Amino acid sequence: MVMFTIRNMGGVALFLAGSTWLWLTPMFATKGVTTSGFLWSATRALSLLAIVGFSVATVGLFARQPWWETTAIGSAAVGLLALVPYWFAGTQGGETTGTVAWNALVHVLMVAGITTLLLVPQLERWVQHQVMPG
């Protein structure tokens, strides 16, 4: 039994990437930052939806379900959408612009990587070859 396959590492990477949306929630805000209000609530809801979506996509990947890619792309889109209220909530709540910008940059790069792997036809075929074989 081989444990360190590209499929397994990709699944773990997908799950871990999804879990980083926790960084955008109020519980990860710097001490003293105001974390109440609609923008933080919207950030929390969208971030948790992205986390659940990435978790479901990971299960689909390991189960070799054809829908896992669509779920991963949808979760990435929801995660990208979560950055909008996060940016305003963080900067208006007292978070440093550097912290907000760093979190946004990391997540934009993750979304770019996921969508590139799953939407560029040559890369998507390679991913499918790694994930779907018997």
Please provide the spans of the model-predicted regions.
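Membrane-interface extramembranous regions
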Residues: 2-134
